[in-house]
Amino acid sequence: MPSHLLVLSLLVALLVVVSCGPGSDHGWGYDENNGPDTWQGKCQNHLKQSPIDIRAPDVDYALLHRMHFLNYDMDGKIELSNTGRTLFAGGFESWQHKQPMIQGGGLKHRYKLAQFHLHWGQNDAVGSEHAMGSLHYPAELHLVHVREGLTLKEALSRPDGLAVVGVFLAKTNDPVANKFSPISERLHDLRHSGNKTELKNFRTKYVLPLDTEAFYRYEGSLTTPDCSEAVIWTVLAEPMAISSHQLHLLRQLHNKELVKSDKNYRPLQPLNGRRIQYRPSKLDRAMICSSFATTSVIITYVAILSAMLI
């Protein structure tokens, strides 16, 4: 074979390996030609997909301990980047012994924070991936944790390999309530796909609401390809505040096609028989316990009365 044909054959083979190899990027996105309706594999044919609509008939109260956010008050350096699909924050592994983690709250393992990213919509009526009674928030933040002792590849093959905390973002005009500023102040540097910037002295508690006691829990999946069903989801009941201007800055980020990325959320997926657990706050728990106590007294009274009549 002539040398130039041999080189050409090798180049073709290399292109096949790169385009079809594991973990390759097949150009998925959120536009009409590459959006969620076109995602293949697990995204199309598996039964425990995310996100979901959290509706009262599908929710059960759960007597779970509170979830602990370890090292979330420690500070460190993170890298913010515009991936062309989302605003991404990583670098937590370099924090070493200060790396944020979660445990408790019904989780059977401890999980280390690997990254967080955001989803948003083109207006305030859409944007969050999860919904509450079919109603959406304008944005949602996902804190992705990997089970301690596992690599990311190993975690993706386990039904509880990842623990993702979902935080709703609610619009507010109160500057005191807004903790999103350390990130939003850097969005001007991240306008184009591929842009990166460092953020020093960052505390992960900046992206948590004040109350983390109440949450919803269910088994689900990644909300992006390959949609692996490896996620224990914790969706916090209390949202975090974000301003109209900050939402505007998110919607100005450009995707890989160099156009404004005004939406990057996956549509709601069917529950397919799954149940959602709700871990209430202190106030809610007191009301529930009071209700249980009253019910217990009534049942006991009826039992005694029945015994007397026999």
Swiss-Prot record:
Zn(2+) binds at H117, H119, H142. Transmembrane segments: none annotated. One of its GO terms (molecular function) is carbonate dehydratase activity. SUPFAM superfamilies: Carbonic anhydrase. It is found in: Secreted. CDD domains: alpha_CA (cd00326). Substrate binds at T223, T224. One of its GO terms (cellular component) is cytoplasm. InterPro entries: CA_dom, CA_dom_sf, Carbonic_anhydrase_a-class, Carbonic_anhydrase_a-class_CS. This is Putative carbonic anhydrase 5.
